[in-house]
Amino acid sequence: MDEIESRIDPEIEDDFRRQWSDFLHHRFTGDIFSPKRRQKSASSLPRRDVRINETLDDLEAMLYAQLLNVSDALESDNKNLSVRANYGTGILSSVLGAELFILPDACNTLPTTRPLAGQGAIERLLERGMPSLTDGLGSRVFSAGELFREVFARYPKIEKYVEIYHPDLQGPLDICELMWGEDLFLSLIHI
């Protein structure tokens, strides 16, 4: 954390954010928007590889893996400084009751969920009403966000310049497909 804090240059990051703000507020006048960090900042520390499956049950490993992304961004000229609770596309479907599907560690791929067993299972899900947002992966997502905020609060530049953005929640049709399975598309045709 100290090393990342020392590598963040407020002048450089303010300029980088200004470029994004200009684009957002229609002040960009070029042909193709491609923000550039004026100066890269290389890490001097060794890195430990973190496997995705390791991060799923270990908040410290999740934080470390996300900070590796921040370190990489500081070494690039165009990446935003950001972290997220990185639990894959099955976050909301797990909150709704779908079983988590974790691939073997060798795949180093984010988890997803298995579909429920047909239309009847979907109907029972709807009858149960609103689930708790801490069901499934929900509690891990909230815990990761809380840890990020707690740790970042001790580092003023990290707190200011490293954005905590929302996890991969997917859209409504994606969630329906995760819950129903590929039969969803045939069911839509036969309605």
Residue ranges of each PLM-predicted region?
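Generic structural signal for well-ordered alpha-helices
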Residues: 67-70, 141-152
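Conserved small/polar residues in nucleotide/adenosyl-binding loops
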Residues: 189-191
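Catalytic cores of enzymes that engage adenine nucleotides and/or redox cofactors via long glycine-rich
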Residues: 151-161
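N-terminal basic, low-complexity leaders that serve as flexible interaction/assembly modules and, when applicable
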Residues: 1-107
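A short mid-domain helix/strand-loop element embedded in enzyme catalytic domains
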Residues: 164-186
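A gly/proline- and charged-residue-enriched helix-loop-helix capping module
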Residues: 107-146
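Metal- and O2-centered redox machinery and metal/ROS homeostasis
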Residues: 4, 135-138, 150, 174-179
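Hydrophobic faces of well-ordered beta-strands that scaffold small-molecule active sites
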Residues: 79-85, 160-168
